[in-house]
Amino acid sequence: MSDRFELYLTCPKGLEGLLAEEAKGLGLDDVREHTSAIRGAADMETAYRLCLWSRLANRVLLVLKRFNMKNADDLYDGVNAVDWADHLAADGTLAVEFSGHGSGIDNTHFGALKVKDAIVDKLRNREGLRPSVEKVDPDVRVHLRLDRGEAILSLDLSGHSLHQRGYRLQQGAAPLKENLAAAVLIRAGWPRIAAEGGALADPMCGVGTFLVEAAMIAADMAPNLKRERWGFSAWLGHVPATWRKVHEEAQARAQAGLAKPPLWIRGYEADPRLIQPGRNNVERAGLSEWVKIYQGEVASFEPRPDQNQKGLVISNPPYGERLGDEASLLYLYQNLGERLRQACMGWEAAVFTGAPELGKRMGIRSHKQYAFWNGALPCKLLLFKIQPDQFVTGERREAQADSGDTHRPLPVASEPARLSEGAQMFANRLQKNLKQLGKWARKEQIDCYRVYDADMPEYALAVDLYQDWVHVQEYAAPRSIDPEKAQARLIDALSAIPQALGVDPQRVVLKRRERQSGTRQYERQATEGRFQEVSEGGVRLLVNLTDYLDTGLFLDHRPMRMRIQREAAGKRFLNLFCYTATASVHAAKGGARSTTSVDLSKTYLDWARRNLSLNGFSERNRLEQGDVMAWLEANRDTYDLIFIDPPTFSNSKRMEGVFDVQRDHVQLLDLAMARLAPGGVLYFSNNFRKFQLDEHLAARYVVEEITAQTLDPDFARNNRIHRAWRLQLR
């Protein structure tokens, strides 16, 4: 074989430039960048060194051959022409990976089979034996990449991906790959800071990936020094003497690096479940003397108390993929920024995030930003210098010069964030509404009400108070609104709400309201299972602010529920599309002879059962699971008081067809009125803003619109929130 080879090094998208610099430093010549890869030329010693030392590559591929191909036969012939006896024993094992498509190969599995067949046939025809396929730890892993009609056939020298260093056997919910973590550290300037003897702190360290990678860089430890099996271990072209030389050189460098006084590298993690897994990872990496992990919140993490010590704070905060997370993340970023200003003066900071707009809430200007990809998710690395002239708030914090006493700042939650002009206007409106509505709510003994409903068009939110919790619903912005501006306004609003309403920031829950299809509005959005008890009109009800799009209590229907309570005494009450049966609880409280509640959702009927039980109601209150239309057609009972509050649109595997309130309301009301006893009353309401009641219903029934009577002061600003009618038999 030649003394020099063409090598391909693959990497995560966005790391090509960094990998090219690293590979040049390790001896790769003629380097060129490609998407998620670089290529160059090297001898075998350099190839080994790249495998051992690259902190950024995924794989090191040694190119065996390039050839043009027009079809599957060309693919077979090109691979079969290689003398595979130079690479693999006839009775050895192999795995094949195929990427790309075209030239008659539109299926990677088919392409891999053709490559495998060509190799097996070559060895069997020559040796009389054939290799077998082993996908996990083969003797040789062959890779073929098809690119615009050219096939690039390679051997994978790495084996398992090089990001798998072997120390991280335990990980958290959303870990960064080790090579991405190393890239972030390099971009953040950690090699320079470490060379100067600087410190490193990660206030949200998870299981310690940043910490271990940082320590390996500082200690001059090859990232894959402890790897025992490589892609070249059983390759017949392997040169053991050269490998031993490279490996022993790396061992000597690591021993020398670890013999130096360790740098101060600390991690802090709020989740106690991650502390021991993180410490185990550090121990497996052999870095227990260098890296320490402690349990602690962002607002309380302590960098080194030595005021002359400089260093890097690095963090990968959560991105907020789950519904309702964005509000809590806003305060997390504010906490992080406040802590940096309080305790890390003169340090540098690096925040790796999939939500860069939240980085603006830290109160520090980012002097440099880099684009990255975390898998398929676009991310940014925000770099900061923690010094007063970079503080957006203009704060100037001077070091305390007391004799040895360290001042510990108050928790961030107690220090209000400075609001932008728009956020202050929004806060003023909230406070004005709260002052007006608070008096009414206290008088009526109501502890759940709406304090804001898109009063200012640029802040398209609904803000509801549930005792000392706040439920925020963001209305979908029109397409004419710039999404970035809408996002900025949302973040402004979220920063203003805790101050204006006097609530704990951690008790603000954000939801996004948009047109819901099918049963999506009823689907579970999270799994916290956090129910809280609220009161209304003398009844106790359970709400859940986090797990579903709606909370279990439609606040706008409060007057209707109170009306039902007043009118229910001695009556048989029917609640259709009952949801969590809050109206049935009010009817039972009002002395109803019986209540029957019908809904398709088992989840909400279980919730309804809990609401009834919470108030001591059970025997006279039936809960029926079923499609309301089908249930009405089959039912022959009569009722004195009926309430119908249907969804605008609904479909389910458990119901026949699709329910559309505009199209189907006449049939629904006719079926329900057939179950109404003489002298009885039916209340019909819905929230479809374009709804029009069929005018022919007035010919059959006594129909009265009562919408204005069903709006309390907290919804008087939005008289289109719902419409309501009272129907009786003629």
UniProtKB/Swiss-Prot annotation:
Q: Where in the cell is it found?
A: Cytoplasm
Q: Its catalytic activity?
A: guanosine(2445) in 23S rRNA + S-adenosyl-L-methionine = N(2)-methylguanosine(2445) in 23S rRNA + S-adenosyl-L-homocysteine + H(+); guanosine(2069) in 23S rRNA + S-adenosyl-L-methionine = N(2)-methylguanosine(2069) in 23S rRNA + S-adenosyl-L-homocysteine + H(+)
Domain named THUMP: residues: 46-157
The record ties this protein, via SMART domains, to:
THUMP
Q: Which PROSITE patterns match?
A: THUMP
Pfam families, A to Z:
Methyltrans_SAM, RlmL_1st, THUMP, UPF0020
**Which protein, by its recorded name, is this?**
Ribosomal RNA large subunit methyltransferase K/L
Q: Which organism is it from?
A: Pseudomonas putida (strain W619)
* UniProt lineage: Bacteria, Pseudomonadati, Pseudomonadota, Gammaproteobacteria, Pseudomonadales
